[in-house]
Amino acid sequence: MRIGLRMGAEIWALLALSMLGVFSGSVVAVEHSRGQKLFLPVYSEVAYGDRRAALNLAVTLMLRNLDSDQSIALTRVDYIGANGAVVRSFLTEKHGLKAMAAETFVIRESDRTGGASAGFLVEWESREPVLPPLVEGVMVNGAYNQGMAFVTSARVLAEKP
């Protein structure tokens, strides 16, 4: 019986080590870019229960300049409704983002203008090739003494030449 337990522990240890190898080997070199057009899907409400009730969510666009040396410029941050139309433009001019700095844009929980399947179009540029920014959406609701949160990541639609 003791031998069986020991072999089981060894198997678990080997499995854990192999998983570490898989995960540590999955790091990929990131290409540098001079600019991108990105789409970030966000969800301002989710259905729940048998009656298809909707739970409203606050949405935060989180944009982080990951380059430790170069600034980037945000040239477009538009909130896009479920119908594909621009609901709100957050920028009227270029907005600089220093190296390693972050910026947030918020859609309040009570704001229903985008519909359930809204999104953001984000465009940025840089004079020199840089690490692309990290662009994520965080959706949160804390109703009924329970927390609910979702995170989405942006998709690249186009690279600046």
Sequence positions of predicted segments:
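Bacterial N-terminal signal peptides
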Residues: 9-22
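A structural motif detector for short, solvent-exposed N-terminal "entry" segments of globular domains
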Residues: 32-56
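Short, solvent-exposed loop/turn segments enriched in Ser/Thr/Gly
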Residues: 53-60, 118
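Asparagine-centered strand-capping/turn motif at beta-strand->loop junctions
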Residues: 63-70
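Short, hydrophobic/aromatic beta-strand segments
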Residues: 70-77, 88-90, 132-134
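Terminal connector regions
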Residues: 111-161
